Each structure stands twice: as structure tokens, then as C-alpha cells.
Amino acid sequence: MSLKIRLTRGGAKKRPYYRIVVADSRSPRDGRFIDKVGVYDPMKPKDDPARVSLEAEKIQAWLAKGAQPTDRVLRFLDAAGLAKRPARNNPKKAEPGAKAKERAAARAEKAGAGEDAAA
């Protein structure tokens, strides 16, 4: 049985409220779960301590048993210091694309030719 620590949605239309639960990965999002380990209320302000409420002992026990947190829950656990989220590093993201490199080279060449003519 593959266990996940994930969010289940509750609340009214356009007023979401999430429970953080441990569930079998094959069960539906809002279906049967094994244990409730916290809550997340996105309608509260970001600096409100009650926005995310976690039961640390239960979560650590489930992580020790092999439960895998989803990406969003892993963010909450990392913020609470219960789990470490690996750093994402994409050095090529800031690098300009091929066309931008061509334009920059053409601009530099044109500027170099203009300086030679002025000298």
C-alpha cells in the first residue's frame, strides 16, 4: 500500500478549506483516508499562524513508516522544519535563448563597426 500525505478539499464553493491527511495513493482525493494530521486554510492571511496547523508527532511517525508527502504538503513540512525539501536549481533558466543571443551578437557587431567608422 503506497501512502501519501496530501490535501483533501472541504469548504464551500469559492471558500476552500483543506485537511492534511494520510491516505492510500489510489483512493480518491476527497475519499477515504487513514489519519488526519493537520489543516490548511488558504483564506486566512499568509502571516496568520493558524493558516497551516500540523500535528508534528503524527507526521513524523507516518514519514518514518514510508508515507510520501505531495509537493504542496512538502512545502508546509519544510516551513515547519519537519522535512527537508530539495533545492531546485536550473542554471539555464536565466540564460538568454538562441534568438536573443543572435540579436546581442548583431548589436555588438554593429556597435563595433560604428566605433571603427568614428575613429
UniProtKB/Swiss-Prot annotation:
**What keywords does the record list, in alphabetical order?**
Ribonucleoprotein, Ribosomal protein
**Ranges of Basic and acidic residues composition bias in the record:** 92-113
Gene Ontology cellular component list? cytoplasm; small ribosomal subunit
The keyword Transport is annotated on this UniProt entry: no
Any one Gene Ontology MF annotation carried by this entry is: structural constituent of ribosome
Specify the signal sequence span.
Answer: none
Note the superkingdom of the native organism. Bacteria
Family statement drawn from the similarity comment of this UniProt entry: Belongs to the bacterial ribosomal protein bS16 family.
UniProt cross-references to NCBIfam families, sorted A to Z: S16
Q: Spell out the protein name for this chain.
A: Small ribosomal subunit protein bS16
Q: What organism does the UniProt record list as the source? A: Methylobacterium nodulans (strain LMG 21967 / CNCM I-2342 / ORS 2060)
Identify the coding gene.
rpsP
